[in-house]
Swiss-Prot record:
Gene3D superfamilies assigned to the protein according to its UniProt record, in alphabetical order: NAD(P)-binding Rossmann-like Domain
GO biological process: protein ufmylation
Functional description taken from the UniProt entry: E1-like enzyme which activates UFM1.
Residues binding Zn(2+): C217, C220, C294, C299
Keywords assigned by UniProt, alphabetized: ATP-binding, Metal-binding, Nucleotide-binding, Ubl conjugation pathway, Zinc
The protein's name in its UniProt record: Ubiquitin-like modifier-activating enzyme 5
Domain of life: Eukaryota
GO MF annotations, alphabetized: ATP binding; metal ion binding; UFM1 activating enzyme activity
């Protein structure tokens, strides 16, 4: 028989679910079968489709064919899932085993009436109301356990809309154990993924794109806690928690989704590593090469596979010099050769090949040579006589 505490806990969960149902309010909009660029108030995709009209994205409709797995539906993960949902992603798979608490309310997305619900269920209900066109699967379990790890691998390898592997995995977890589990799974499955994180003091964060065998995985250069194999749970103290700013988490989530869209829709450049320091507004970027002696055997195997693949050399695009667009004009403007700056614009300046001046260098008119065109004429006067003449001027 259940204890009083268990029954009270169950009552709270049922009350939370009832509050969530009541909060849904009016009916959801009807599903939209085809994305349209028509600019009307009732079209939620018109501004997204404008990216296609402006030449940023070739085919935005492809996003409805994509499947993304979000692991961790906390401060970063919930906002990431919301952004992807609003962008019209085809399918979203959510993983988390935690429950919504009132302490989560500073992290955006979740609402007080959802306290007590599992994060994935609360997120799925809210996201489905935002965009009913998105297929959402929610998995409420810890991926780091042996049994659940295999379930996780099966889901990301067969959970797409077509029954194959997902297009991208986004790690939004807050511990190294879960990151290592995602890293292991993606290395084994040759699955591309993004790792993200926010510092404990909430004023810095990062995202990292990981392509097994091509870029450094999470085990190639692990944090000290991972490298020394310390149990993270022993580092946590009662009554002490990490700081959390919704601004920092929103920024990191924005970077994460922005680069995910660039990868999925093939536009722009995907950043391999992007950091963020809120105190100095510093955004470092870099590329990380895989470690040949990585502890992860699957990572080393993927590196060997990439090494044996024939390199594809891209032919250089040859463009024809068409000259100035408007050679003749009504304003008397003439165009000089870009690689031949006029000599009079930069007297005495020697430029190496490929270097141009951005402006003309002014001649110093204060020197006698510049004003008279030669040296000052010799004078028989002494220094005292010259000073006396200057005083009388």
């Amino acid at each position: 028989m259940a204890s009083v505490d268990e029954l009270q806990k169950k009552i709270k969960e049922l009350e939370a679910k009832l509050a969530a149902v009541e909060a849904k309010g009016g009916p959801m909009r009807q599903k939209i079968e085809v994305m349209s660029s028509e600019v009307v108030d009732s079209n939620p995709y018109s501004r997204l489709m404008a990216l296609k009209r402006m030449g940023i994205v070739n085919n935005y409709e492809q996003i409805r064919e994509k499947t993304v797995a979000v692991v961790g539906v906390g401060g970063v993960g919930s906002v990431t899932a919301e952004m992807l949902t609003r962008c019209g992603i085809g399918k979203l798979i959510l993983f988390d085993y935690d429950k919504v608490e009132l302490a989560n309310m500073n992290r955006l997305f979740f609402q007080p009436h959802q306290a007590g619900l599992s994060k994935v269920d609360a997120a799925a209900a809210t996201l489905q109301n935002i965009n009913p066109d998105v297929t959402i699967d929610a998995y409420n379990y810890n991926i780091t356990t042996v049994d659940n790890f295999q379930k996780f691998c099966d889901t990301i390898s067969k959970g797409s809309l077509t029954g194959g592997a997902v297009d991208l995995v986004l790690s939004c977890v807050d511990n190294f154990e879960a990151r290592m589990a995602i890293n292991t799974a993606c290395n084994e499955l040759d699955q591309k993924w993004f790792e993200s994180g926010v510092s404990e003091n909430a004023v810095s964060g990062h995202i990292q794109f990981i392509s097994p065998g091509e870029s450094a995985c999470f085990a190639c250069a692990p944090p000290l806690v991972v490298a020394t194999k310390v149990d993270e749970r022993t580092l946590k103290r009662e009554g002490v928690c990490a700081a959390s700013l919704p601004t920092t988490m929103g920024i990191v989530a924005g970077f994460l989704v922005q680069n995910s869209l660039k990868y999925l829709l093939e536009f722009g450049n995907v950043t391999h590593y992007l950091g963020y320091s809120a105190l100095t507004d510093f955004f470092p970027t870099m590329s990380l090469q895989p470690n040949p002696t990585c502890d992860d055997a699957s990572c080393r195997a993927r590196q060997e596979q990439r090494r044996l693949q024939p390199r594809v050399e891209l032919a250089a695009e040859v463009t024809e010099d068409c000259g100035p667009v408007h050679q003749d004009n009504d304003w008397g403007i003439s165009v000089l050769e870009e690689n031949s700056p006029a000599d009079e614009d930069c007297p005495g300046l020697k430029l190496v090949d490929g270097v141009q001046v951005a402006y003309s260098i002014p001649v110093d008119s204060s020197t006698p040579e510049s004003s008279t065109g030669g040296a000052v004429a010799a004078s028989e006067l002494s220094l005292e006589d010259l000073m006396q003449q200057m005083k009388t001027m």
